Amino acid sequence: MPNYLFERFSDDYYRLINQTGVKQASPKQEGNEKYNSCWDGAISPDGTFYFSLSSEGGKCEHAKLVKYDYNENKIVDCFYAGDLILPNIRHLPASKLHTSINFLPDGRVIATTHSTDRAPHHKEWMPFGHHNHVWEGFPGSHILVYDPKTGKAENWGIPVPRESIYGAKYDPKHNRLYMIGFMRGHVYSYSLDTKKVMGVYVEDLIDTGEVYGDINQ
């Protein structure tokens, strides 16, 4: 009798989803064993596929932005969030880049961090019990920017203290980054021109019909 049950993440498991005309890649994971999820991926205007290596379920790790090398079938590091945000070991980690990878007109990649994993000494991820704590909490999501031309990344700071950004979208018309807050359910707007943050509205359908958000808690 044929066996239709395969071990999760085995070679047979991955082969099940192949379709005609679809190329499936399984690049090697050396150096990324602690990551167990991906919550965003986007193709840049030049055709490069960027995605986030994320941590949840007690891995206690900071996220990576990586890109896929099609010709070599390998994952290439762009930045490790832990190198950019100067984290405290007792804080909740910046474990994800969650639905926030965007591309600026000059080719740079901009994304925001989000936390859905526990600190190493916590027994469980309890964001609403910890995020406001000075030593045990979450200082806030960071805006991180990667320049593929130079290979350098930089931290633009925390737009909203004690808030975790659940998603972000760049608006080229107004040169703004719109962000949805996980803790408070608000929409925020960051101007790349003035470097100022403005609270737009409580998370909901905006009257203009231009900004939408969805938070599941």
Predicted features, each with a name:
Residues 1-34:
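A short helix->beta-strand "capping" segment at the edge of beta-propeller domains
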Residues 25-63:
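Beta-strand-rich domains and repeat architectures in extracellular enzymes and scaffolds
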Residues 28-33, 79-82, 89-93, 156-161, ...:
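Surface loop/turn motifs at the tips and blade-to-blade linkers of beta-strand repeat domains
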Residues 36-40, 87-101, 163-169, 208-217:
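Repeated scaffold domains used in trafficking and secretory/extracellular systems
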Residues 37-38, 63-64, 73-106, 114-116:
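Blade-loop segments of beta-propeller domains
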Residues 43-46, 103-106, 171-174:
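Residue-level detector of Asp-centered blade-edge/turn motifs that repeat once per structural unit
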Residues 54-62, 111-138:
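Short, conserved, GDST-rich strand-edge loop motifs in beta-rich repeat architectures
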